[in-house]
């Protein structure tokens, strides 16, 4: 008989055997994350609005683990749930489907309003599971470009400053204004997602945030974040106002200089989100710099709707041709 339960420290040895096929770096990092999660139980005891750490559930059949799924609430908006890991045994499509449906039902009952998964476009079986098996829809794509041998045409660095919590409303407004209209209902963010949470030191990644202002009006015209999970591989993410001519060379120069202040040997990547108004121009720039796109992920979204309980035995009164319930 199969059952789904929270991951515990007693499950780790079985999980380690299950993920032996992963690359050495991925296996070590994955094991470290699961070990930390299994030892911190407080996150599982609090309501959804206070959750901030990953939670992993396993599907087991007697003593055999058939699959696992990890979810992470969005920082500042825990009602948006991100599915970050889904592993199941080969030819166990139904196990993956059970885990996803379990997460949607469990967190939906707690108040979650949307679920997101970013799936590599080469994983056909996983895409089929989410799209056809679990009712997700594909919104757009996110690409990752490697900044290897990046040679800027301009040596200057943009004059970013550290982002403060007081900047959050303006940054959220900037991000949302740059979304293509088609994707706004699913991809919009609230200001709390751009505030530094009090538990920042407990999450399994490190992020620096910066903003660029118009020197005349002090209006925020660009937002930059630098994220790493291992202090070796850094991902740069940029949001810019398409009404301003902002030099990507200067933005990247600044980002690389910030990373090099802390690390001498590192790998840098930049995210390209295809659902923004600046996506085409940014992609053209990346090609002109002879950079390589090393990964494309499909952004999959599922909105959770609670069924509305309908009133029974409603009396209808007809008055002057109008129906009043």
Where are the model-predicted features located?
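Conserved acetyl-CoA binding element of GNAT-fold acetyltransferases
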Residues: 78-90, 231-245
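Conserved GNAT acetyl-CoA-binding A-motif
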Residues: 107-120, 262-275
């Amino acid at each position: 008989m199969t059952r789904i339960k929270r991951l515990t420290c007693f499950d780790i040895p079985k999980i380690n055997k299950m993920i032996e096929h992963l690359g050495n770096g991925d296996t070590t990092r994955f094991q470290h994350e699961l070990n930390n999660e299994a030892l911190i139980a407080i996150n599982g005891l609090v309501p959804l609005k206070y959750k901030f750490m990953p939670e992993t559930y396993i599907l087991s059949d007697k003593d055999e683990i058939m699959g696992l799924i990890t979810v992470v609430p969005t920082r500042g908006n825990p009602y948006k749930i991100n599915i970050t890991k889904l592993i199941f045994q080969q030819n166990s499509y139904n196990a993956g489907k059970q885990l996803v449906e379990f997460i949607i039902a469990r967190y939906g009952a707690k108040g979650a309003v949307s679920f997101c998964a970013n799936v590599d476009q080469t994983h056909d079986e996983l895409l089929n599971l989410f799209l056809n098996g679990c009712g997700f829809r594909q919104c757009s794509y996110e690409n990752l470009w490697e900044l290897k041998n990046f040679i800027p045409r301009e040596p200057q660095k943009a004059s970013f400053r550290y982002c403060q919590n007081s900047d959050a409303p303006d940054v959220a407004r900037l991000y949302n204004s740059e979304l293509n209209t088609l994707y706004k209902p699913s991809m919009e963010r609230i200001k709390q997602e751009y505030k530094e949470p009090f538990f920042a030191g407990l999450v399994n990644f490190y992020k620096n945030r910066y903003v660029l202002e118009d020197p005349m009006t002090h209006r925020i015209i660009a937002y930059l974040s630098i994220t790493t999970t291992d202090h070796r591989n850094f991902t740069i993410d940029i949001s810019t106002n398409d009404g301003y001519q902002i030099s990507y060379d200067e933005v990247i120069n600044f980002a690389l200089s910030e990373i090099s202040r802390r690390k001498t040997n590192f790998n840098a990547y930049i995210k390209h989100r295809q659902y923004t108004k600046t996506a085409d121009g940014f992609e053209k720039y990346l090609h002109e710099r002879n950079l390589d796109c090393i990964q494309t992920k499909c952004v999959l979204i599922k909105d959770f709707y609670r069924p509305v309980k309908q009133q029974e035995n409603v009396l209808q009164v007809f008055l002057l041709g109008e129906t009043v319930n």
